[in-house]
Amino acid sequence: MTASDPTSKPAASTPAQDLAARTRANQERFAAGIGSLDARELENLLMNATNLAGTYYPEDRDKSGFALYAMSEADRARPLAERVPPTPLRHYYGYRDGKYHDDLYLRGGFADIRTIRKVLADDGFDQMGERIMEFGCSGGRMMRHLEAEAAANEVWGVDLHSAAIHWAQAHLSPPFHFMTNTTAPHLPFEDNSFGLIFAGSVWTHIGELDDAWLLEMRRILRPGGRLYITISDENTLAEVARISPDHASNGHVAELDAATGMLSKDWVAFVTRTTPWLQRVIYRREAWLERIGRWMEVRHARPNAYGWQTGVLLAKRG
């Protein structure tokens, strides 16, 4: 028998073996009861795993599970549009000077809905009586201001974040309807189900599945229905750099440019960082509109319609 060479290096592991080893280590941590994964570790584990199924952000839980609760009497006494979710569910909306402000959160949602209503009115589209969906609703920051529409037809909110959906189900339903979706580009609705779908700052995070999700929106829209979404584009880059030069996203773009040289090339889109909440997707607006215009009619594109983002109104042909 030949002795092994003590100077030889072990064979390099494959990505699958590395993932399996990390998974076993995480399972052992849970089994030993020495602590759970923090949110960032859990996000990276879930979103970077190679699989064919969609994923979502689950409720925080320990070994015994988790519980859901009805809204408090204090919240029940408030008008529906003034019920504010816990700060972890607000995703920086209403955040200023190092803290969250309830009034800014509520006013911002109202202002964004007012913008959508104006865009639709300018396009000659009346959303009253239409079945409506907010894609990426979180705690209902915007759709809570559609009570009149909800009295006329169903208004749905869907999101990856199950805790936000559970909060909304307890505090905003009725009159609204909510469900948790996954990253897989499919929603459990029939073809031609909705007259209006809107999504604020969602296509800014989707990444490689953006076209698949756009086509899913087209599937569930009725012919003549409208899709209103917001995107980050070259105008967004310029506005962020001009107004907030110390914003972290400027550094993310510079880091990717240093690695790829993209800004000196004819780029059409790029993604900084990873995972749905962290990644940022930037489109060259005209190139993107030209491509998606083959699938849906482009009715309107307005820079700075949603903060620094460009609002885009699309219509399903037919």
Identify the role of each PLM range.
Residues 19-99:
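N-terminal, positively charged/glycine-rich alpha-helical extensions of SAM-dependent methyltransferases
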Residues 108-128:
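Conserved alpha-helix/loop element of class I SAM-dependent methyltransferases that forms part
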Residues 128-138, 228-257:
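Conserved class I S-adenosyl-L-methionine
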Residues 141-186:
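Class I SAM-dependent methyltransferase SAM/SAH-binding core
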Residues 185-197:
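A short acidic, Gly/Pro-enriched loop at the edge of an enzyme's catalytic core
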Residues 206-216:
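A short, conserved alpha-helix within the catalytic core of class I
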Residues 276-295:
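Short alpha-helix
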